[in-house]
Every structure is written in structure tokens, then in C-alpha cells.
Regions:
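Histidine- and acidic-residue-rich, metal-dependent catalytic cores
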Residues: 1-179
Length: 179
């Protein structure tokens, strides 16, 4: 496929990622390369990103998609088997258990969208309020941010997020709130 005089270090790394990114951390998956094979770090990173993207995106061949929070929990549960546990922990710290753009219901009933994550406290992101507990809609032009890590706002013993939700169920387009 490639002539040896055209192979650079970069093209070899790219080809290796193409070969390895469906291999699991425990060397199951495909292609089967044997028990002594060492999956490259770039392939392990792409494997995590590819899985997250596939599970959270609507595909032509797959009508269902999962909300990001459920995907993160699923992938964490496969850490050490499907995914490199160190890289998986880093991915969760970067993305958050409730990734930016996630729709959540707070324990007091408000609907909010995650706008920033805190790698030191994965269950207390910064959110933008969208609807109050009394179902009052907060328009995109009004910016109401709440740092769920603010212990004065949320008592430490209380988890601020009751559940992650699918915006389509509520007929919400979150894009205007991201701008």
C-alpha cells in the first residue's frame, strides 16, 4: 500500500492508530494481534475518543444515542478492560462526569446546562439555569450561572444534580445557551 520511501514517522503512527484503535486495552476486539502486542498510546487515546463519539452521536446506521453522562459511566465501567485506566481517568477529568452541554435536573428541581467542569469535584460542575423548578423558562439572553461547587449555595452533604437528561425529551435546543 505504501512504498517504504514514502513512510515517515508520522504516516507510520497514523497507520498504526488506524490498525489498533478498535483493539481493547485487554487485547480483545479487533484485529487480534496476540498476547504480546502493545497498543500504542495514540491508539489508546483515539479508542476512548472514538467510543465516546460513537455513543453520543446519532449515526445513519444507529438511530439511538446516549446522553453524555451515561456514556461516561459506561466507559468508566469498562476501564481496564476496554480502555487504558489511566487515560480513561484523564478523559473523565477533562470532560467531567457531566460533560459541557449536558442537560441536568438539579436536586431543587431546576433544569440546567453544564457550562464548565471541575476536575477536582466531578459531581459539582458550573451550570447555566434554563428553567426554574416552577417551570419558568430563563431565556438565552439572561445569563444565570451557578457554581455547584459553591458550598454556600449547595450544602456539602447534598449532591446538587439529581439526574442527567436528554434535551430532545424536553424539546430543548441547547445551542443558543452555549453562545
Amino acid at each position: 500500500l505504501l512504498r517504504s520511501d514514502q513512510l515517515t514517522e508520522l504516516t507510520m503512527k497514523v497507520a498504526l492508530v488506524g490498525l489498533e484503535h478498535h483493539m481493547r486495552f485487554d487485547l480483545t476486539g479487533y484485529p487480534r494481534m496476540g498476547d504480546q502486542w502493545e497498543i500504542g498510546v495514540m491508539s489508546r487515546i483515539v479508542s476512548i475518543a472514538d467510543c465516546y463519539d460513537a455513543m453520543t452521536s446519532r449515526r445513519t446506521y444507529e438511530t439511538d444515542r446516549l446522553i453524555p453522562h451515561r456514556v461516561m459511566l459506561h466507559m468508566l465501567g469498562r476501564s481496564g478492560k476496554n480502555f487504558d485506566p489511566v487515560l480513561m481517568r484523564l478523559f473523565v477529568c477533562l470532560m467531567g462526569l457531566y460533560p459541557v452541554g449536558s442537560l441536568v435536573r438539579l436536586t431543587r428541581g431546576d433544569l440546567a446546562m453544564v457550562v464548565a467542569t471541575d476536575p477536582t469535584d466531578l459531581v459539582r460542575p458550573v451550570v447555566r439555569l434554563l428553567r426554574t423548578a416552577q417551570e419558568q423558562i430563563i431565556p438565552p439572553s439572561e445569563l444565570q450561572l451557578v457554581n455547584l461547587n459553591d458550598r454556600g449555595f449547595w450544602p456539602e452533604a447534598e449532591l446538587p444534580i439529581r439526574e442527567a437528561l436528554d434535551p430532545e425529551v424536553f424539546g430543548l435546543d441547547l445551542a443558543p445557551y452555549l453562545l
